[in-house]
UniProtKB/Swiss-Prot annotation:
InterPro entries: GIY-YIG_endonuc, GIY-YIG_endonuc_sf, UPF0213_domain. Belongs to the UPF0213 family. This is UPF0213 protein SPD_1364. SUPFAM superfamilies: GIY-YIG endonuclease (SSF82771). It comes from Streptococcus pneumoniae serotype 2 (strain D39 / NCTC 7466). Residues 3-78 form the GIY-YIG domain. It comes from the Bacteria.
Length: 99
């Protein structure tokens, strides 16, 4: 895989979503779950990675993040179910073991 950055969706303990971007998915997920990540996720631990999409540049990942954040919850859920072919979750699960 030749991705330089990722847009990702976390599901928080309370069922809410957190959307972000990163250049190192494994490190970013560990930071979130250690309680040192975003203020939003610190109050809603643990978080679970449910979607990750790779991009050729950080700017593309940031644009995808911004677009996704503007959607209402039903639109986000529709996107997640319709774009499983782009979801890299199974790749990360195979590479890292259980997430």
């Amino acid at each position: 895989m030749d991705h330089k950055a990722y847009m990702y969706v976390l599901e928080c303990r309370d069922g809410s979503y957190y959307i972000g971007y990163t250049t190192d998915m494994r490190r970013r997920l560990a930071i979130h779950n250690s309680g040192k990540g975003a203020k939003y996720t610190r109050a809603r631990l643990p978080v679970k990675l449910i979607y990750a999409q790779g991009f050729a540049s950080k700017e593309e990942a940031m644009s995808a993040e911004a677009l996704f954040k503007r959607k209402k919850r039903p639109q986000k859920e529709e996107f997640l179910s319709e774009n499983q072919d782009r979801n890299l979750l199974s790749y990360f699960e195979e590479s890292w073991g259980v997430l």
